[in-house]
Structures are given as structure tokens and as C-alpha cells.
């Protein structure tokens, strides 16, 4: 099982893993998934699955603060409604000043500007009925370091700053992920997937 932000969703293909190594897996990576999202997705998955190994992308663990709240909440919105989603909403809105608990508990409020345009897909998304036919894998094309010259990204970018402060909230949920894995006798593998937004400042 793979958990984390979009970089892992686009990097690890469960079909290829099965075809080449015979390993069954699922990718639960979601764009801008904060560590609190990784923790609650792990809890949600363990309701029905018993993985031997969980691979966790730690890119967001090093953030000083969450990025745009609208992007970060996608991790929440994809989850099927239930106890874990409710707890996710309560804890996330307590740690993020941009987050409105009402909009998390009643997500249709975010569609108020286009009620007449809503389709079946919108309702399936809100109700958590969307299905992934790629087992969570996001098929993306080549990423370029410079879109004007089409210079392909080739390694970690240098940065003058030596150390990046850490986010206490992310550290807290990282520890909860470790504890949850121990409770369920699951091995954890922490990885940092290569991406063009990574640099020595974040790495340190």
C-alpha cells in the first residue's frame, strides 16, 4: 500500500508492480496530502485491508505549514463518509486556521456557485463513490524544470539555505502513523519520491 502526496501517486504503478514482481498493492496517494491525511487514509484502509508493508511518502512531513487549504482538502474529500472522515475533519480544522468545519461536514456548500451545473460525478465524488480503475495510480507525463526551454529535471536543485524548520503537526501525525503500524504489525517504509520541486533546503 502506498500513501502520501501526488508525487507517489504518479510514481508507483500497482499494475506494473504486479506484472513484474507479482506483488498486489494499491496507491492511496492524493495531491497535497498532508501527514494528517496520510494518517487517516491509513486508518481507513486498515478497516478492510491487512497489508504487510505500507510505503509512506514523506514530502509533506517537512513542510513548515500546509499549502493552499483548497488543495490540501482534496485528500479529505476523496474519503468515503464514516467515522474516520468525521475525525479527520474535526482534527484538521483544529490545526488549520483556513479550514471551515461547516464546509468539511457539509461539502455541498463549496458548490453553491454552480448548483444548476452539478452532475452525477459531483455527487459520486462527495459521497465517496468514485472508483479508480488504475488502483490509485495517476498517469502523468514528463515534468520539465523549465517549460519554456523544455529542460528536463535532472536531480535535486541547490539552495543556499541549510536547514528547513519542521511542522510540529506533521511530526505529530508521523508518529501516530508509526504507532498505528506497530499496533497492526505492519512494516513501514518511508520514501522521498524524486520531484522537480525538491531542493537541498527541504532535504536538510
Q: In which residue ranges do the predicted regions lie?
A:
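Membrane-embedded segments
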Residues: 3, 7-92
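Short amphipathic alpha-helical interaction segments
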Residues: 5, 169, 202-203
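Acidic/histidine-rich, surface-exposed loop or edge segments in extracytoplasmic proteins
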Residues: 20-24, 154-161, 192
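A generic structural signal for alpha->beta connector loops
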Residues: 22, 185-187
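Structural motif
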Residues: 53, 187-189
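Short, well-ordered beta-to-alpha junction loops that form the rim of enzyme active sites
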Residues: 59, 192-194
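Secreted/periplasmic serine-hydrolase-like ester/acetyl group-modifying domain
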Residues: 71-184
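Substrate-gating cap/lid alpha-helix
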Residues: 195-204
